[in-house]
């Protein structure tokens, strides 16, 4: 039986000049330790659902695997909080290459500040997906409506893999990076072609979020929040359209505005 993704607790709410006791729903935090070929690799603090997708997506994002068939055996013991991954390759992982984040310039045309493993795994988008303004806003609305966990707790981030007119998969997590890793794992497990897909996201587009999207292989990210300057620089270099502040009836296009399609 899986862990509960929410927990109930009695709280006191201040409203209209008085404290009133009521029951509230909170998002559950779950530490999951990932063992790779018998060695401890990482502990992810996450929402306890879609855990196989999370682990596989995280390992792909870190460059440990590229395809699901590189995993020989996968098991999760939720009672202990462990995921066990046996790879087809028995080559010993150099953990320092993955856990030590080294910031520096990438080889090539002076790319900006990639982490060591990101140089190997970030993909430059080949096909630039186009989308109408109406569908940009529709996808954001649809994602927000679909997240029951967010509506119950207000304590999670949402991410959706989409075509240009509909949601394909939506994942929620207390960690914004985890939500994206769950989508990556979903794509690998179900062998979803991603070159013509985009990601709709509830949080800020930081450089790490942008890199997660690049590793998945999509060519557009739509967020209801703001991007950072470094994320925009990376998006230009990786050929990814970035849209922020997608709310109500408006949004900002930060890179590749030519892909907004007017009828």
From Swiss-Prot:
InterPro entries: Cytidine_deaminase-like (IPR016193), FdhD (IPR003786)
Keywords: Cytoplasm, Molybdenum cofactor biosynthesis
Alphabetical list of Pfam families matching this protein: FdhD-NarQ
GO cellular component terms given for this protein: cytoplasm
Active site: 107
Subcellular location per the Swiss-Prot or TrEMBL entry: Cytoplasm
Family designation: Belongs to the FdhD family.
Reported function: Required for formate dehydrogenase (FDH) activity. Acts as a sulfur carrier protein that transfers sulfur from IscS to the molybdenum cofactor prior to its insertion into FDH.
PANTHER family: FORMATE DEHYDROGENASE (PTHR30592), SULFUR CARRIER PROTEIN FDHD (PTHR30592:SF1)
Protein's recorded name: Sulfur carrier protein FdhD
Organism: Bacillus licheniformis (strain ATCC 14580 / DSM 13 / JCM 2505 / CCUG 7422 / NBRC 12200 / NCIMB 9375 / NCTC 10341 / NRRL NRS-1264 / Gibson 46)
